Swiss-Prot record:
Residues 1-24 form the signal peptide. Specifically expressed in root tips. The gene is AGP30. One of its GO terms (biological process) is regulation of root development. It comes from Arabidopsis thaliana. This is Non-classical arabinogalactan protein 30.
Length: 239
């Protein structure tokens, strides 16, 4: 019950007491018909002062909020499509290539060619054939150390050129053990073997790679052609 309710209750109670007192006084006044119930006269009650209530507080003004915005409706996206499953292909097998074999060389006989010169006095002692002259009938020797030591010799022509045929026991499979030597000159004034292309120690045979010249047919046999030199003799020059 609030303050106002309590005040109203007290006011009603005071009025009830006042009414009861007035009624009692009227009944028990002197000269009443009841001589035995004569009561002294009560003084009138002072006026009841009602309690002063504090002024009601002004209602609290709640802050005014702006109206809530309507919720933003997001666009409805279509359902995502299931990923396309690509077919699984079997692994690709690498192609099977035929085995590669080293080139086969037909076994042939061996022919060695070269040129022999006599150096010019200007280049005596120098490995240079500029101004040199070809030597005719110079002796060239081929030594092959294979299963059987084989030696063969030949002489140069007027152009100093020679073609030396190895023995038929020597083939192109055996040339690693073959060396060509410059042996002797018919000219006593140009007879010392020079070191040009190892003519004195033995020159290694080099195969001719030019097509059409790498082999030759002689005496019904096929020969693989190899180069050596050129070789040269040192001249005896006037001082």
């Amino acid at each position: 019950m609030g303050i106002i309710g309590k005040s109203v209750s007290l006011t009603l109670f005071a009025l009830l007491c006042f009414t009861s007192s007035v009624f009692t006084l009227g009944v028990n006044q002197p000269g009443s018909s009841d001589p035995f119930h004569s009561l002294p006269q009560h003084l009138p009650l002072p006026p009841i002062k009602l309690p002063t209530l504090p002024p009601a507080k002004a209602p609290i003004k709640l802050p005014a909020y702006p109206p809530a915005k309507a919720p933003i409706k997001l666009p409805t996206l279509p359902p995502a499509k299931a990923p396309i499953k690509l077919p699984t292909l079997p692994p690709i097998k690498p192609p099977v290539l035929p085995p590669v074999y080293p080139p086969k060389y037909n076994k042939t006989l061996v022919a060695v060619r070269g040129v022999v010169y006599c150096k010019a006095c200007k280049y005596a002692g120098v490995n240079n054939v500029q101004g040199a002259k070809p030597v005719k009938d110079a002796v060239v020797r081929l030594v092959c150390k294979n299963k059987k030591n084989s030696i063969s010799e030949t002489k140069t022509d007027k152009n100093g050129y020679f073609m030396l045929l190895a023995p038929k026991t020597v083939t192109n499979y055996d040339i690693k053990g073959c060396r060509a030597f410059l042996v002797k000159s018919p000219d006593t004034k140009c007879s010392k073997v020079s070191s040009l292309h190892d003519g004195g120690k033995g020159s290694v045979l080099k195969p001719v790679l030019k097509p059409g010249f790498s082999s030759t047919i002689m005496r019904w046999f096929k020969y693989s052609v190899y180069n050596v030199g050129p070789f040269a003799f040192e001249p005896t020059c006037p001082k």
